From Swiss-Prot:
Reactive bond (site feature) positions: R43, D44
Domain of life (superkingdom): Eukaryota
Protein known as: Serine protease inhibitor Kazal-type 2
Tissues where this protein is expressed: More abundant in epididymis than in testis.
Keyword Secreted recorded: yes
Any one GO MF annotation of this record: serine-type endopeptidase inhibitor activity
């Protein structure tokens, strides 16, 4: 009986501390467009995958697309889609 209570307590602790980690990593990242002076982006290749499932060469080009289209595109992940 004591072993079952101990297992339950450990499970509750694990869920309590792991929950915020999963929520933090499951959210999409908002691009920080204020750092770029648009129009005109650097030519560095650091691809990002937008929530519109388009791969952008870098975060600046994603910001340019947001500015032109008015869409609320977030960064799904770093790297190609």
């Amino acid at each position: 009986m004591a072993l079952a209570v101990l297992r339950l307590a450990l499970l509750l602790l694990a869920v309590t501390f792991a929950g915020p980690l999963f929520r933090r990593f499951s959210k999409y990242k908002t691009p920080f467009c204020a750092r770029y002076q648009l129009p005109g982006c650097p030519r560095d290749f650091n691809p990002v995958c937008g929530t519109d499932m388009i791969t952008y060469p870098n975060e600046c080009t994603l910001c340019m697309k947001i500015r032109e289209s008015g869409q609320n595109i977030k960064i799904l992940r770093r790297g190609p889609c």
